[in-house]
C-alpha cells in the first residue's frame, strides 16, 4: 500500500492507495504548529493506524509546502513552523523504520496528474497552479524534476516579460513580491492577482469569485477583464513553454475552476511561441483536493 501525506499549515491529510492507484482510506488531523515532537507523533500515529488497518507496512510519501535543503536535509516550510528547519525526512524514516520520501506540494500535485490513467501517455507533464500563489512542477517519465535547489517549477517567481509590459503599458506597476523581488508573475496571475488587476483597472475591490460571477452574467467590464487576464497569462506561459516544451499542461488551484482558463488559453498561445512550436494539450486538474495525497503516495512509484 502507498501512504500519501498532504501536509499544510492547518491539516495533515493521509490517503492510502492500492497498487492500482485507487484511494482506499483517508483521514485528517490538525497540524501541530509549535511542537516538532507533536508534529512527528501526529504523522507516526496516522501511519501506525494505516498499518493496522491494512495489515502491512505501507510506503510513506509526504507533500509539504516547502523545499528540502539539499545540503543538510533540513526543510524550509514557512507555513508549517513546527517542521521548518528540521531534518523531517531523516527523522520520520528512523521512527517509522522505512524509506520516507518527501517533496513539495506543487510537485506532488503535478505527479498526481501525470499518473492519471488518461495522462500517463505523455512523457513530459507540466503542472501549473493558479491559486493563492502561482507554482507548479515538471514530471518527466513519471518522475519529478526537482533541480539542484528544489526550485524547479517555481514559475510564479519569474518576472513579467517585456511583451507583458508592452501589452499592459510601460508604466504598469511592478509589485513587490514576498520573495523580495519586483514584478513576479504570481502577483498578477494568482487568484489574488486576478482580483488586483480588476481593482487596478476598474477601482473596485472585488474578489475573484465575484468577478467570475459577473463574467458569467455577461457583465462587459468583467468580460474585458478576463480577456486581459488571459492575454497576460498567455504571454507569461509562452515564455515557460518555450523553455520547457511539455506534452501536457494541467492547471490546478482555485482559478482552474473557471472554465475560460482552460478553454480559451490555447488559442492565445501561438503568437507567443516559436513558429515551429506546437501548443501542448491544456487540461484542468482531474483530482482536486486529493491530488496532494495522491502525488505524495506516488513518490514511491518513481523507482
From Swiss-Prot:
GO terms for molecular function: ATP binding; N-acetylglucosamine kinase activity; zinc ion binding. Keywords: ATP-binding, Carbohydrate metabolism, Kinase, Metal-binding, Nucleotide-binding, Transferase, Zinc. The keyword Transferase applies. It comes from the Bacteria. One of its GO terms (biological process) is peptidoglycan turnover. Pathway: Cell wall biogenesis; peptidoglycan recycling. ATP binds at residues 4-11, 133-140. SUPFAM superfamilies: Actin-like ATPase domain. It holds the Pfam family ROK. Zn(2+) binds at residues 157, 177, 179, 184. It is an enzyme of class 2 (transferase). InterPro entries: ATPase_NBD, N-acetyl-D-glucosamine_kinase, ROK, ROK_cs. Its EC number is 2.7.1.59. Catalyzes the phosphorylation of N-acetyl-D-glucosamine (GlcNAc) derived from cell-wall degradation, yielding GlcNAc-6-P. Belongs to the ROK (NagC/XylR) family. NagK subfamily. HAMAP family: GlcNAc_kinase. This is N-acetyl-D-glucosamine kinase. The lineage of its organism: Bacteria, Pseudomonadati, Pseudomonadota, Gammaproteobacteria, Enterobacterales.
Amino acid at each position: 500500500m502507498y501512504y500519501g501525506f498532504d501536509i499544510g499549515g492547518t491539516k495533515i491529510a493521509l490517503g492510502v492507495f492500492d497498487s492500482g492507484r485507487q484511494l482506499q482510506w483517508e483521514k485528517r488531523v490538525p497540524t501541530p504548529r509549535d511542537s516538532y515532537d507533536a508534529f512527528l507523533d501526529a504523522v507516526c500515529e496516522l501511519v501506525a493506524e494505516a498499518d493496522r488497518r491494512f495489515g502491512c507496512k505501507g510506503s510513506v510519501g509526504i507533500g509539504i509546502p516547502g523545499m528540502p535543503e539539499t545540503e543538510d536535509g533540513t526543510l524550509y516550510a514557512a507555513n508549517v513552523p513546527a517542521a521548518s528547519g528540521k531534518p523531517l525526512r531523516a527523522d520520520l524514516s528512523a521512527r517509522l523504520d522505512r524509506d520516507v520520501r518527501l517533496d513539495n506540494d506543487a510537485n506532488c500535485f503535478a505527479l498526481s496528474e501525470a499518473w492519471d490513467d488518461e495522462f500517463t501517455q505523455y512523457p513530459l507533464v507540466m503542472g501549473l497552479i493558479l491559486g493563492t500563489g502561482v507554482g507548479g512542477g515538471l514530471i518527466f517519465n513519471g518522475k519529478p524534476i526537482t533541480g539542484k535547489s528544489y526550485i524547479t517549477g517555481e514559475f510564479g517567481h519569474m518576472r513579467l516579460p517585456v511583451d507583458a509590459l508592452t501589452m499592459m503599458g510601460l508604466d504598469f506597476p511592478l509589485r513587490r513580491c514576498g520573495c523580495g523581488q519586483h514584478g513576479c508573475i504570481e502577483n498578477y496571475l494568482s487568484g489574488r492577482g486576478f482580483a488586483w488587476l480588476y481593482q487596478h483597472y476598474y477601482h473596485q475591490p472585488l474578489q475573484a469569485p465575484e468577478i467570475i460571477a459577473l463574467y458569467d452574467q455577461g457583465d462587459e467590464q468583467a468580460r474585458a477583464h478576463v480577456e486581459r487576464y488571459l492575454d497576460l497569462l498567455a504571454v507569461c506561459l509562452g515564455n515557460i513553454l518555450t523553455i520547457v516544451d511539455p506534452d501536457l499542461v494541467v492547471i490546478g488551484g482555485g482559478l482552474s475552476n473557471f472554465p475560460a482558463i482552460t478553454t480559451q488559453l490555447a488559442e492565445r498561445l501561438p503568437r507567443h511561441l516559436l513558429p515551429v512550436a506546437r501548443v501542448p494539450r491544456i487540461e484542468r486538474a482531474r483530482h482536486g483536493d486529493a491530488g496532494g495525497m495522491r502525488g505524495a503516495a506516488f513518490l514511491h512509484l518513481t523507482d
